[in-house]
Structures are given as C-alpha cells and as structure tokens.
Amino acid sequence: MTAFLWAQDRDGLIGKDGHLPWHLPDDLHYFRAQTVGKIMVVGRRTYESFPKRPLPERTNVVLTHQEDYQAQGAVVVHDVAAVFAYAKQHPDQELVIAGGAQIFTAFKDDVDTLLVTRLAGSFEGDTKMIPLNWDDFTKVSSRTVEDTNPALTHTYEVWQKKA
C-alpha cells in the first residue's frame, strides 16, 4: 500500500511558510495513528518543519535532492526509486507519503490510498495540494468531527484506488 496523508482547508490549502496554517490537535493524533509503525516519507522542508525530529515510533524517510543532506535518526534518499527499494526491504511496513507538495507530485502515479482531512474553513497560506484524479478513487469512509470553531470542523476521509 502507498498512501497519501494530508490535511487541507476547503480551498485545498495545505501549507503556510512551511507549516500547517491551523492548529488542530485531533488531526495531529490522526496523523500519528496513520504513521506509527509505518514508513513515513516526507520532503526535506516538511521534515524540518517537525518540532521534534525524527518523529518517534515510525521510520522517517526524507526525500531530498541535496546529496549531502543528513538527518540523524532518519533514512535519507534522493529519488523515488530509492524509497521503493527501501520499502521492498521492509515489506511488513506500509508506505505513507506525508508531503509536501513536491513529494506528493513525485508519487502521484503510485498512490492507491488517500487519507485526507478536510477542514471546513478557509485559511491563509502559500501551498495547495496537488491536483488528483478523484474519479480514479472510491470513498470508503468518512467521519466528521465538529469543533467549537466552525472553521476547524473537519472530516476524515479514506479513498481507495479503483481496481
């Protein structure tokens, strides 16, 4: 399985200055639940946005073009083929692609599961989720969580690629 995991506002926004444009603890718990025990692939900038690195209890894989980049406690790779080679060596762990936008683009043709959190509000930011062909996927679950701040009301959706 290769899954995309991300949160977006109602306009598809996913980032602001290298960080999330909102603070949503419930979604951070969801992110953790979806990545613990798995291979989590992120780009260098996304990795560096984490307050504590590497994220515990999961394999942190950093995909970067910087040949000399080092990330203590993480696996650093320089192309998509290296990610799949690493995953093949660890068949017991699912592959979760967690951004940013360039990393999603690199894996766009390989994804079979979409784990998206949709926030009801509209936020300020500078990075949107890449376009996906939603017709290639079927929604298999959806759960809405109300928030006292209507903009933070959010829905967790799981989509599977059609056979």
UniProtKB/Swiss-Prot annotation:
<dbReference type="InterPro" id="IPR012259">
    <property type="entry name" value="DHFR"/>
</dbReference>
<comment type="subunit">
    <text>Monomer.</text>
</comment>
<feature type="binding site">
    <location>
        <position position="58"/>
    </location>
    <ligand>
        <name>substrate</name>
    </ligand>
</feature>
<dbReference type="GO" id="GO:0050661">
    <property type="term" value="F:NADP binding"/>
</dbReference>
<feature type="site" description="May be important for enzyme function">
    <location>
        <position position="22"/>
    </location>
</feature>
<keyword id="KW-0560">Oxidoreductase</keyword>
<feature type="binding site">
    <location>
        <position position="117"/>
    </location>
    <ligand>
        <name>substrate</name>
    </ligand>
</feature>
<feature type="binding site">
    <location>
        <begin position="63"/>
        <end position="66"/>
    </location>
    <ligand>
        <name>NADP(+)</name>
    </ligand>
</feature>
<keyword id="KW-0487">Methotrexate resistance</keyword>
<feature type="binding site">
    <location>
        <begin position="5"/>
        <end position="7"/>
    </location>
    <ligand>
        <name>substrate</name>
    </ligand>
</feature>
<keyword id="KW-0521">NADP</keyword>
<feature type="domain" description="DHFR">
    <location>
        <begin position="2"/>
        <end position="161"/>
    </location>
</feature>
<dbReference type="GO" id="GO:0046452">
    <property type="term" value="P:dihydrofolate metabolic process"/>
</dbReference>
<keyword id="KW-0046">Antibiotic resistance</keyword>
<dbReference type="InterPro" id="IPR001796">
    <property type="entry name" value="DHFR_dom"/>
</dbReference>
<dbReference type="GO" id="GO:0005829">
    <property type="term" value="C:cytosol"/>
</dbReference>
<comment type="pathway">
    <text>Cofactor biosynthesis; tetrahydrofolate biosynthesis; 5,6,7,8-tetrahydrofolate from 7,8-dihydrofolate: step 1/1.</text>
</comment>
<comment type="function">
    <text>Key enzyme in folate metabolism. Catalyzes an essential reaction for de novo glycine and purine synthesis, and for DNA precursor synthesis.</text>
</comment>
<dbReference type="GO" id="GO:0046655">
    <property type="term" value="P:folic acid metabolic process"/>
</dbReference>
<feature type="binding site">
    <location>
        <position position="27"/>
    </location>
    <ligand>
        <name>methotrexate</name>
    </ligand>
</feature>
<feature type="binding site">
    <location>
        <position position="27"/>
    </location>
    <ligand>
        <name>substrate</name>
    </ligand>
</feature>
<dbReference type="InterPro" id="IPR024072">
    <property type="entry name" value="DHFR-like_dom_sf"/>
</dbReference>
<dbReference type="GO" id="GO:0006730">
    <property type="term" value="P:one-carbon metabolic process"/>
</dbReference>
<feature type="binding site">
    <location>
        <begin position="14"/>
        <end position="19"/>
    </location>
    <ligand>
        <name>NADP(+)</name>
    </ligand>
</feature>
<dbReference type="GO" id="GO:0031427">
    <property type="term" value="P:response to methotrexate"/>
</dbReference>
<dbReference type="GO" id="GO:0004146">
    <property type="term" value="F:dihydrofolate reductase activity"/>
</dbReference>
<feature type="binding site">
    <location>
        <position position="80"/>
    </location>
    <ligand>
        <name>NADP(+)</name>
    </ligand>
</feature>
<dbReference type="GO" id="GO:0046677">
    <property type="term" value="P:response to antibiotic"/>
</dbReference>
<feature type="binding site">
    <location>
        <begin position="98"/>
        <end position="103"/>
    </location>
    <ligand>
        <name>NADP(+)</name>
    </ligand>
</feature>
<dbReference type="InterPro" id="IPR017925">
    <property type="entry name" value="DHFR_CS"/>
</dbReference>
<feature type="binding site">
    <location>
        <begin position="43"/>
        <end position="46"/>
    </location>
    <ligand>
        <name>NADP(+)</name>
    </ligand>
</feature>
<dbReference type="Pfam" id="PF00186">
    <property type="entry name" value="DHFR_1"/>
</dbReference>
<feature type="binding site">
    <location>
        <position position="32"/>
    </location>
    <ligand>
        <name>substrate</name>
    </ligand>
</feature>
<keyword id="KW-0554">One-carbon metabolism</keyword>
<dbReference type="GO" id="GO:0046654">
    <property type="term" value="P:tetrahydrofolate biosynthetic process"/>
</dbReference>
<protein>
    <recommendedName>
        <fullName>Dihydrofolate reductase</fullName>
        <ecNumber>1.5.1.3</ecNumber>
    </recommendedName>
</protein>
<comment type="similarity">
    <text>Belongs to the dihydrofolate reductase family.</text>
</comment>
<feature type="binding site">
    <location>
        <begin position="6"/>
        <end position="7"/>
    </location>
    <ligand>
        <name>NADP(+)</name>
    </ligand>
</feature>
<feature type="binding site">
    <location>
        <position position="32"/>
    </location>
    <ligand>
        <name>methotrexate</name>
    </ligand>
</feature>
<feature type="binding site">
    <location>
        <position position="58"/>
    </location>
    <ligand>
        <name>methotrexate</name>
    </ligand>
</feature>
